[in-house]
C-alpha cells in the first residue's frame, strides 16, 4: 500500500515501495 521499510511516502505508480520522489524502489523490500 505504498509502504516499505518504514517509509510512508506517496507512490506515483502502483508499487509496494516508493522513494522520496515518489519513484518505485525495491531496496530493502522482500516481495
Curated annotation (Swiss-Prot):
Annotated InterPro entries: CNTX
* Tissue-specificity statement: Expressed by the venom gland.
Q: Which cysteines are joined by disulfide bonds?
A: 4-18, 11-24
Q: Where are the membrane-spanning stretches?
A: none
Indicate where this protein resides in the cell: Secreted
Recorded GO cellular component terms are: extracellular region
- Gene Ontology MF term list: sodium channel regulator activity; toxin activity
Top-rank taxon: Eukaryota
Sorted alphabetically, which keywords does the UniProt record give? Disulfide bond, Ion channel impairing toxin, Knottin, Neurotoxin, Secreted, Toxin, Voltage-gated sodium channel impairing toxin
Disulfide bond in keyword set: yes
Q: What is its main location?
A: secreted
Look up keyword Nucleotide-binding and say if it applies.
no
Domains: entry comment: The presence of a 'disulfide through disulfide knot' structurally defines this protein as a knottin.
What does the function comment of this entry state?
A: Blocks voltage-gated sodium channels (Nav).
Q: Which family does it belong to?
A: Belongs to the neurotoxin 03 (Tx2) family. 06 subfamily.
Q: What is this protein called?
A: U8-ctenitoxin-Co1a
Amino acid at each position: 500500500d505504498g509502504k516499505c521499510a518504514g517509509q510512508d511516502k506517496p507512490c506515483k505508480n502502483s508499487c509496494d515501495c516508493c522513494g522520496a520522489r515518489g519513484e518505485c524502489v525495491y531496496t530493502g523490500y522482500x516481495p
